[in-house]
Amino acid sequence: MMPAMRASLILGCLLIIGPWAILAENPLPTIFPDKDELVQALHSSFTLKCTGESEVSWQNPNSNPEKQNVVIRSEENNSGLFVSILEVSDASAFDTGLYTCYHNHTQTEESEIEGTDIYIYVPDPNVPFAPPGLFDHIIVVEEDESALVPCRTTDPSSEVTLKNIESSRTVFAFYDSKQGFAGNFPPGSYICETTSNKMVYQTEPYILQTWKATHNISVEMEAPKTMFRAGETIAIDCIVLDNEVVDLKWTYPGKQRGVGIRNVEESKVPYQRLVYTLTLANATTEDSGEYECAVIHATLDNRVVKKTNITVHEKGFIDLEPMFGSEEFANLHEVKSFIVNLHAYPTPGLFWLKDNRTLSENLTEITTSIVTTKETRFQSKLKLIRAKEEDSGLYTLVAQNDRETKSYSFILQIKVPALILELVDKHHGASGEQTVGCLAKGMPVPDVEWLVCKDIKRCNNDTLWSILATNGSEISMETHQDDEQIESQVTFKKIEETMAIRCIAKNELGVVARELKLVAPTLRSELTVAAAVLVLLVIVIISLIVLVIIWKQKPRYEIRWRVIESISPDGHEYIYVDPMQLPYDSRWEFPRDGLVLGRILGSGAFGKVVEGAAYGLSRSQPVMKVAVKMLKPTARSSEKQALMSELKIMTHLGAHLNIVNLLGACTKSGPIYIITEYCFYGDLVNYLHKNRDNFQSRHPEKPKKDLDIFGLNPADESTRSYVILSFENNGDYMDMKQADTMQYVPMLEMKEPSKYSDIQRSLYDRPASYKKKPLSEVKNILSDDGFEGLTVLDLLSFTYQVARGMEFLASKNCVHRDLAARNVLLAHGKIVKICDFGLARDIMHDSNYVSKGSTFLPVKWMAPESIFDNLYTTLSDVWSFGILLWEIFSLGGTPYPGMIVDSTFYNKIKSGYRMAKPDHATHEVYDIMVKCWNSEPEKRPSFRHLSDIVESLLPMEYKRCYETVLHDFLKSDHPAVTRMRSDSDNSYIGVTYKNEHKMKDRESGFDEQRLSADSGYIIPLPDIDPVSEDESGKRNRHSSQTSEESAIETGSSSSTFIKRDDETIEDIDMMDDIGIDSSDLVEDSFL
């Protein structure tokens, strides 16, 4: 046959046989009777027979669990077919439905049944509708799609009506008794209705819902891990977004073995999300392979498949893949990286070693990093930022997990140019032999060679250098080398003339050379002597410089008091009087032989204060107990000038009840002595500490722990010393050292109270109520007779007297600059006296003073403008007065308790921090402190205003008592008063200001008016008006002199009583023993 004809014949056969061959391969079973539907009578029986080429099964509609009337059995057929018989007895409405026979091998778990169908009706007049399925009453369809209401009837001839419950209207639609009503129905509730035996029957409501279906399917597969070890759990998520009308099928290696748990979770926030999870616990290597999830749209022919590969290892592993060799090189200062790739599971821990020691993570020029490139792929990088010579060494990367540890090591060599470490001349003494050593290093190790130049003056010409020739007798050479260095030595048996020798070291990175001059032995000794002299000279110069620096940094004594001469127009610059330009009146001079010194009351870095007895200082008091200020014998000239300045300022100021008054001075034929009043009770801080246990306050139950503000332990009170000005050195107050008992000269004490304070002590022991008190409560306030306790009235009295004393200093344009309780003394009668005790205080070791350059400053007492701008005025003294007021009402507490003077302290002062009210202060007293601590100096009250405020808190009787004591003082023959009175008859008493608004002018500006009471030195003062005699009687404050009518004529000190040469202080003490009243001979202070 022709080939073309044969091909056509074969193709035709295929076309004819092909479809039958396909049908023959998958034929459907056969049901007998061979009909589409049958109607069976109620309670009858029927049989269905199914025949197939393989095993067959039935799907029947019987949904009544209580009636087991269906029997299925198999029969054998001689033709080799498989036969299944379905027998139904006592048929009922529950048996109405579709019966399907199918081959078993054609069905899967998730596929629809494909077989041969027959529909059976069993009419029941009482049950016109076939029983519905479990979920048939909920109908969900896509928008604009046809819906099926499955109200099937048991009788095919029944007429059925569909009604909408909400509208109660009949819905016209196509009806099939095997399926129900089909059509496009709006959402709502529907019922089916039919009539049987003249009765109307209705179904349960059918709920119809529609949704807008998404045609697109968005699927994501998430597998946190794709690599596992045997025994771990595999978890894979298949996520469907924005579509819930889908079906999902898993395909994976373990599905045939029935392993795996499949779950689904749905969330609608923030968007529609279906998460299908496949979980396989205790994975094995058989679970390795491809995992697939197929998502199929429920109503559309859409399908999306996602796949991933899972690998399960029997155990963990680590594989290292270095990108470099076992020995590497890097140039000096080169940036170089070394990378190692890793394939490992589980994730390993990685670290680098250098010379078997862990590389520190804080290195700045060697960094390590780890990057994960894939799930089981990693990359570790060692990077040299600027390679250094010391970076050479053995580097090791160690990788380890819970099952395995692996490492990779390599040697790194840093190439370094040749470098000569030292070139030395080793002289061998008298033999004349000299050895020159050259030590060099580099990587690679350099080679060394020697050159010599014998014409020493022309060695800068390289052509005169020649290679050093060695011979065994005169010149020899030795070389020693290790892995890093090389040392070459040249030995000369004898050098007869000076020459230069050059060492050259070279390797592949560079060449370096150093030269050395070799000197003949005869010249060496001369050079040695010259060098020794030069070194000695340098040492001497350095020592002198150090001594000068130490001398300049040593603190110098300076008087704190300053007298203002003028002020700049803007008020920010003050010009102070140079005390050395003030005159010194010789009338203050007192003969040295009239002064007997006793024990030391206090000593400091610059001087001391000594108790003394002055003979002939006063006409009415032949012997007076005094305090004598003097410098130490080692004092410098600048400190002598400072003490002389203090003397001149005191003579300029004049006398006042509330300052420590000058009594005399010894300035000739010996050291300078300043003689001042002696105050029996010492400084105010000491007095407050001593009497704080006897303080009568509104809070007598206050516990002892409140003493912590003083930095003291109450249990130690019995051991604390309170003798005049002698204190224990606790660092809080003056470093007053106890005097040597061998130096002590006994002083006479008064036998009766002073005639200027002969007023009994008040019984007033309660806080001032600031109302007028009866005379019986305030009588004899200024006396210290009898009871040793303290009251709030005493504290107000101290405050008032300090304010009066500072008012007097302010009227003299005097700025104190160190106003504090330690610089306030207490005399008999509780008379307060302001002083400057800096000379006798060890301020270098006093915590109240802070070093600033060559001086020490009491920072905690200073105003902000003094601390930060070095500006001292009367208004800055007002700030210090507020601090002193806090000290008084805290009974001697240290200001800013618990705070040290540092940057934090300064910042707090700048930001407006102020101390809280002390325990014993009333709100009125604390208000005074706050006014004194105003950050703007011009808004602080003046001392005159402060005196008025405190005076208003005191009883009127106290004011009268104080004015009486002041008046008696100014009329007395006190040496300070008489010397000033003899200078001028113009009284200080009664000087006042024209207007109240000029109070600020007293601190901030002065005119050209001058007082004649200033010892002849002219100081500018504000405008003042003299007052009348009546006004003078009402306010007698400021006088440092009395009027001519009350003046007591006195002579100079040279005409007063002089101590006999053979008389001692001990002789005076004996006067009491023989009945002589010494009270007229000794005046304790001026009282």
Swiss-Prot record:
Q: Give the EC number(s) listed in the UniProt record.
A: 2.7.10.1
Extracellular face residues:
25-530
Q: Which cysteines are joined by disulfide bonds?
A: C50-C101, C151-C192, C238-C293, C438-C503
GO biological process assignments: cell migration; cell surface receptor protein tyrosine kinase signaling pathway; chemotaxis; embryonic cranial skeleton morphogenesis; positive regulation of cell population proliferation
| Annotated Ig-like C2-type domain residues | 27-114, 118-211, 217-309, 315-409, 417-519
Q: Which residues are glycosylated?
A: N77, N104, N216, N282, N309, N356, N362, N461, N471
Q: What does this protein do?
A: Tyrosine-protein kinase that acts as a cell-surface receptor for pdgfa, pdgfb and pdgfc and plays an essential role in the regulation of embryonic development, cell proliferation, survival and chemotaxis. Depending on the context, promotes or inhibits cell proliferation and cell migration. Plays an important role in the differentiation of bone marrow-derived mesenchymal stem cells. Required for normal skeleton development. Required for normal development of the gastrointestinal tract. Plays a role in cell migration and chemotaxis in wound healing.
Please identify the protein, giving its name as recorded. Answer: Platelet-derived growth factor receptor alpha
Record gene name: pdgfra
